Amino acid sequence: MEGVLYKWTNYISGWQPRWFVLEGGTLSYYDSQEDAWKGCKGSIKISVCEIQVHPSDFTRVDLIIPGEQYFYLRAINAAERQKWLVALGTAKACLTDNRTKREKELQENSEALKTKMSELRLYCDLLLQQVNKIQESPLAETSAGSGEGGDETGNLVKSTCTTFLKTLEECMHIASRTFNPDLLSRTPPGSPSVATIKPQKIKSNDPKNLHPGETRKDLINTSGTSAHESGPDNEPPPSPQENISTAHTESGLMEDQNDLIEPNNGSSSSTQDHEEPVEEQQTDGSTEDADHSQEEQQEVSMSPTQNKQEVQEDIQTDLELNETQSENKQEEEDEDKVDTFFSTMSHRFSDIILEEDSGIPTQAFLDSCYAIVPVLDKLGPTVFAPVKIDFVGNIKKIQQKVVSDPESFPTLQSIVLHEVKTEVAQVRNSATEALLWLKRGLKFLKEFLSEINTGVKDVQGALYNAYGKTLRQYHGWVVRGVFALALRAAPSYEGFMAALVSYEGDELKEGFRTGMHRDLDIYLPAMENQLSILDTLYEEYGLESDEIV
């Protein structure tokens, strides 16, 4: 659809006729139909904007992207406005339906993947329980004493466990990078810990024929063999994170082996420290082997069901303790830090890194200017609309200058110096003039926020003082009247504070005031420094103007 609509330009020029074209979900406007070949003067995406119908003016419709773009439009009559509303609503509905469909598909895929992750964790629990049961059963001891058959069985079980645990750990790391890490940070109820797996119970040789020291060495070699079989020869090179996770898993298994083997080596090590006859050493060794066999029989005689219940009870207790500690830690963090509007801004003056000779990066500065516009909305979206329109209009004038030759205007100073050189700096609607009014508007906001930061709770008084220090001297009686009306409609201190939080009710928390002072103490000095640099530049080239509008 296309046609003529009246667009609000500023509080001096008022409503001006423009040629509008709605195509492909984008509304673009031109000076006139004849000048359309020159390119559009501006555009707005219908899918992301709010379409607001004026409550009293039956010819007006507003298109708003909060904090970014504002199109205030009027049709020739109510019937014409209705046509545009139908066209705009249809375009928005079509685009929204497609976007909703994509979001729904993404959500369904996410839920399906989460379900698969839960199943994977269940399979992990079952495998760990089965391995634990096999290791605790008499069959494991019998097969361990059967020579090569026991050696094969032991290596196979250990290799399978190591490979499965490593693969499972890799899957969990991938999932944690894809979704919220908290999803995988806790062990589900009933999941046996890795420490319950006791690889040393499956012996590769008869311990009666080996010295205790050789038994320990053989176990370590067996562990190394199984790790080698499931290692890099059969799998792609792991990432650094996978190396770390594998190292932790292997070190945990080795610690369990050492803890259970060292008591058996204690007597042998003390025996080896002294020179004694060979017969005595053999006698001591046979005695130790007999004791060790009795201990193993006692362990085997334990009920697998009883062992499983004890493991589950221990894990459940640890899980509850970890959850309690996590909740307490989260509560402490929530009390210490409260997000404010200034800590969650997409772009901030305090994040701008100046270039050589205090050069202010153009795009970063303009993005920070766009990001502070919502403060005017929080003061009053209706009464401050003319101020906001003028503020955003100046930003766009500078943006158009940058778009014309981005490489030539990396800093604000380069724009001003270029226009000074070409003698267009003081021409009406030049980028230099737009920057002049933009920095005046920023000074107004800085003075107002500075008063609020010092503890002033009279929002209307703070606005009046800031206006008197910055903009009032450049305004005639008409514009002063507009500002006076806006100041009288300013919100209360509590209402303004409530608009500066990310979550409703945060303004009542103890950490909110501290967070607000913390954020403004960082934000305002950086803003003041950059405005001071611009003031110095304008004074140096005599670009300041006392003209009253």
From Swiss-Prot:
Protein name as catalogued: Pleckstrin homology domain-containing family A member 8
Question: Primary place of residence?
Answer: cytoplasm
| Chain spans, region Disordered | 180-245, 257-312
Q: Name one Pfam family in it.
A: GLTP
- The segment(s) forming the PH domain are 1-93
What species is this protein from? Danio rerio (Zebrafish)
Lineage in the entry? Eukaryota, Metazoa, Chordata, Craniata, Vertebrata
What PROSITE patterns does this protein's entry cite?
A: PH_DOMAIN (PS50003)
One of its GO biological process terms is: protein transport
UniProt subcellular location? Cytoplasm; Golgi apparatus, trans-Golgi network membrane; Membrane
